[in-house]
């Protein structure tokens, strides 16, 4: 999928940005996010970096109904090796 392609591009020296439409769809790529993007730097002893940005919408809004309004950023924050960024103000 897109996340796997992004991981491969990152390992090849690029700095890809992968967009996932909503955070709930990121669960389909969870294996790649958790077991590859987040762990390859640690498993390689720092020899490999995965400079990948995964951008996704989270929370209610955008008229996407209940199935697409999850807020999983707190859950992702508990995965070692991931950094979670979220705007705090309108200016952000």
Sequence positions of predicted segments:
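Conserved thiamine diphosphate
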Residues: 7-92
């Amino acid at each position: 999928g897109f996340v796997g392609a992004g991981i491969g591009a990152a390992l090849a020296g690029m700095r890809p940005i992968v967009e996932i439409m909503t955070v709930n769809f990121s669960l389909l790529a969870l294996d790649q996010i958790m077991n590859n993007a987040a762990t390859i730097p640690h498993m390689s002893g720092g020899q490999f970096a995965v400079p990948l940005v995964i951008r996704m919408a989270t929370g209610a809004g955008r008229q996407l109904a209940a199935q697409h309004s999850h807020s999983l950023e707190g859950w992702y924050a508990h995965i070692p090796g991931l950094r979670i960024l979220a705007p705090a103000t309108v200016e952000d």
